[in-house]
Amino acid sequence: MTLAEAAELIRSGAILSLAGPESALDALPAGNWIAGTIPYFMDAAGGVVSTEGKVFVTPIPASGKATLAHYGADQLKSVIGNGPDNGFTVAIVPAGSAAHKTFAQEAVNDADAFLKPTVGWVSGVHLSDLGKVTPKVYLGTTGQKFEDGIVVAHVALPESQLASIEIVNIFEPGDGDTLRFTDTSFEVGDCLVNGEKTNLAAYVKAKGLDHGQLPLVGDFGGAHINASI
């Protein structure tokens, strides 16, 4: 969607979740939206790289009453806890931030993690800007952008509706080795391959998987979850 179209939608009072380049998000008016930076998208034609002038717009159902907020890295226990008893939460967190690391490692242990549905994504930057530009998230109600913390839309639904989360994954587990990890971390040294302690980097290289094009597909409560190598 063009910036003009997105701005018109914002001014209409619509509640939105947005994604796009930082320059595009900076140009939008204040309103009922949250956003994160990223130039990479999938549309009907396939993969798209948008570096300026357009944003990806996801409307939040009008039947829901939304509360938009930013939680600092020291407030993350409230992200799930403050979610509505009947509804869902949309969350966006900057890649590599303290909030990203903490939420990824600890959110699953929240008592409400499987009772209050939370969906979202990790904001990023163009690969050519890695190390030069930081991922951002935006709280549209104030017009602020942040390098850390999580922006959310807590969406309460009427009693006649129920939120259910499903995951669409184009990858499936193979029938090869089973890998298990004893530590929860973004960085891994050794893991267990079919029960035997093995250096992950050496294993990946020996299997010819160091091109990074295929993920590890894990089982999380019955759902197939990808972990990039």
Task: Specify the residue positions occupied by each region the protein language model found.
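Small-residue-enriched flexible segments
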Residues: 1-23, 29-32, 38-41, 47-88, ...
